[in-house]
């Protein structure tokens, strides 16, 4: 359902429909621009964009991780209403969901996306070409984007080979260059009609790679910094150069005054390259370089460091230059804003509000800028609510709520929950009414998305032909044969992600069991019961953690109970602890006789609520 066309949409008659370019720089921190006074970065083109437009001091991400925040940006919904709320990779939009692109397409816009999508892997209902994009070129799954030298990129769900590339940092064709060139081709092709060019580029997100021939590397290669810190800064400068190239192209085509450009990060800064001298990261993305005032936290949590992003908007002749705005807004507001600029009508079920009055002027638009009653975020058990100067946050599942006065404590250092229980109660009530269970899209061909995730490592071939040296294998010597095992029960499994319990005993390290995390997160303790196929002497257990790029669910504390029948005694046979490693781990104990084994899991290596197992086997005969 779409809202009736509001009266203010008639401004289209006064302003011809604009072209819209939205550039997202992945993981770029709020302070990581030279216009913010940062001495490590040189970003003259982005600085000029700010000088000729408006820079926002309180623009906030939709979430603090890649996929969830992009879903908020695309759909106009906050993370209590979105379909993509986890960052495991590939989680899809539902088939019927509207995006910025689909809204603009209805009013005649050409729509192109170039970079990292994150709202649905190949073979799912969330692919961009099903959500309004005429073309999308780049990465669909964010794990695929963890290499700048993948063997292929994706164009409208079809693979585009990249010659000479072998994954990770090994290759000759730098993906980011191709992505920017495709965006330029799109702009040239559509110069005579209104277009929406969405450019969610991957740099400076890791793996931190930049060709030695890139002019940005020459600026940083001799700095007395850690290598990856130099590469990161060079990647930021490279993105800046490409922002300049996009603007140069618009000038060349006579489109500069017909095009509004948005530039932002996607979530709060990641505090990379920490050491004793740089406890908030070598570049301090969440530390004011001029005053030392800090935003607490960073990417992955809901403190200000995880949500505050750079946001600049420029439209020559329409937006007054050199403005700095303190308007409080966030990613769900982007869709209604762009829809209004295009003379389009956004869906009626969005959470965002248009900020066009703030951009163009209330006198020009003919109405005052609307304000949010409150803003809402949720992420893997974390919850945050912002109302005016007050922010309530629950930093994790089962943790106490905290309350901060951001007007006087932007660093979130003084918890005022005890002093202002009524305010906290009000914000907690807003949080409760803001959450709806997530309803994700579906996969018809999950194997395509899995292939793209493996392509990070250079795997462009079917699973049966994978070079197994890319992952650790669990040694089979001394194990009771896995082929006889059977899953009796499990506490939960992530069925929507095809992370089933049976994969813990299938002998393939590339698949794994993961406990349910969507639509609801299942918390510890987790349990797996396995039938060994007959009575055996059991003297140990062998465990292999998941072999992809994440650690979610990797087991730490657990106990193991054996029995000759499906009924288990109260006392466990042995208590165990595993480490954070990709290599197989073995834990031996005094031998017992049994057919059934119950593994009960109490904690995860990173403190999360999940459990996952790539392979598990039992030592004995």
Regions found by a protein language model. Name each.
Residues 196, 540, 596-598:
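Short, conserved beta-strand segments of beta-strand-rich sandwich/propeller modules, principally
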Residues 540-574:
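Extracellular ligand-binding interfaces
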Residues 1-402, 406-429, 433-437, 441-448, ...:
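Formylglycine-dependent sulfatase
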Residues 569-590:
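Extracellular carbohydrate recognition and processing domains
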Residues 600-607:
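Short beta-strand-plus-loop segments that form exposed binding edges in beta-rich domains
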Residues 316, 406, 613-621:
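Short beta-strand-to-coil "C-cap" segments at the C-terminal boundary of structured domains/repeats
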Residues 457, 466-535, 546-553, 557, ...:
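Disordered, acidic Ser/Thr/Pro-rich linker "stalks" and the adjacent N-terminal cap
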Residues 264, 314, 491, 544-546, ...:
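Predominantly extracellular/luminal cell-surface or secreted proteins
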């Amino acid at each position: 359902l779409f809202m009736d066309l509001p009266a203010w949409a008639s401004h289209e008659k006064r302003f011809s429909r604009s072209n819209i370019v939205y550039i997202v720089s992945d993981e770029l921190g709020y302070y990581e621009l030279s216009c913010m006074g940062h001495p490590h970065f040189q970003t003259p083109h982005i600085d000029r964009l700010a000088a000729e437009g408006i820079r926002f001091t309180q623009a906030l991400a939709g979430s603090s991780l890649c996929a969830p925040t992009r879903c908020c940006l695309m759909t106009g919904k906050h993370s209590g209403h979105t379909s993509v709320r986890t960052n495991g990779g590939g989680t899809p939009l539902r088939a019927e969901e509207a995006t910025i692109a689909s809204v603009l397409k209805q009013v005649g816009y050409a729509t192109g996306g170039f970079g990292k999508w994150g709202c649905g892997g190949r073979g799912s209902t969330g692919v961009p070409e099903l959500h309004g994009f005429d073309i999308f070129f780049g990465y669909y799954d964010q794990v695929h984007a963890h290499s700048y030298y993948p063997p292929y990129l994706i164009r409208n769900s079809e693979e585009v080979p990249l010659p000479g590339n072998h994954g990770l940092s090994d290759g000759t064709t730098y993906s980011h260059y191709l992505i920017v060139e495709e965006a330029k081709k799109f702009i040239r092709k559509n110069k005579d009609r209104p277009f929406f060019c969405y450019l969610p580029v991957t740099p400076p997100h890791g793996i931190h790679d930049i060709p030695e021939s890139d002019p940005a590397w020459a600026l940083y290669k001799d700095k007395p910094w850690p290598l990856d810190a130099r590469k990161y800064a060079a990647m930021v400068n490279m993105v800046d150069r490409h922002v300049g190239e996009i603007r140069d192209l618009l000038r060349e085509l006579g489109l500069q005054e017909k095009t509004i450009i948005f530039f932002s990060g996607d979530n709060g800064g990641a505090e990379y390259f920490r050491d004793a001298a740089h406890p908030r990261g070598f570049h301090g993305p969440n530390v004011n370089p001029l005053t030392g005032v800090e935003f607490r936290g960073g990417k992955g949590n809901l403190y200000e460091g995880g949500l505050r992003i750079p946001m600049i908007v420029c439209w020559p002749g329409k937006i007054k230059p050199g403005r700095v705005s303190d308007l409080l807004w966030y990613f769900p507001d982007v869709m209604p804003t762009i829809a209004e600029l295009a003379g389009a009508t956004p869906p009626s079920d969005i959470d965002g509000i248009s900020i066009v009055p703030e951009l163009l002027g209330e006198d020009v638009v003919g109405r005052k800028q609307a304000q949010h009653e409150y803003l809402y975020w949720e992420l893997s058990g974390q919850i945050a609510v912002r109302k005016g100067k007050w922010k309530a946050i629950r930093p994790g599942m089962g943790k106490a709520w905290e309350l901060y006065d951001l007007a006087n404590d932007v660093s979130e250092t003084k918890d005022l929950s005890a002093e202002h229980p009524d305010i906290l109660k009000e914000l907690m009530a807003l949080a409760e009414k803001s959450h709806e269970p997530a309803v994700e899209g579906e996969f018809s061909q999950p194997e395509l998305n899995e292939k793209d995730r493996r392509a990070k490592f250079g795997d462009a071939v079917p699973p049966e032909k994978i070079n197994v040296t890319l992952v650790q294998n669990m040694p089979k010597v001394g194990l009771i044969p896995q082929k006889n095992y059977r899953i009796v029960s499990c506490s939960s499994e992530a069925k929507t992600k095809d992370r089933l319990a049976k994969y813990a005993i299938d002998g393939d390290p590339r698949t794994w069991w993961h406990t349910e995390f969507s639509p609801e997160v299942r918390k510890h303790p987790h349990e797996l019961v396995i039938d060994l196929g007959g009575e055996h002497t059991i003297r140990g257990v062998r465990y292999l953690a998941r072999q992809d790029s994440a650690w979610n669910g990797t087991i730490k504390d657990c106990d193991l109970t054996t029995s000759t029948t499906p009924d288990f005694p109260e006392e466990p046979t042995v208590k165990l602890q595993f480490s954070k490693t990709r290599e197989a781990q073995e834990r031996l104990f005094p031998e017992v006789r049994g057919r059934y084994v119950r593994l009960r899991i109490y904690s995860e290596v990173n403190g999360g609520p999940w459990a996952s197992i790539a392979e598990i086997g039992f030592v004995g005969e």
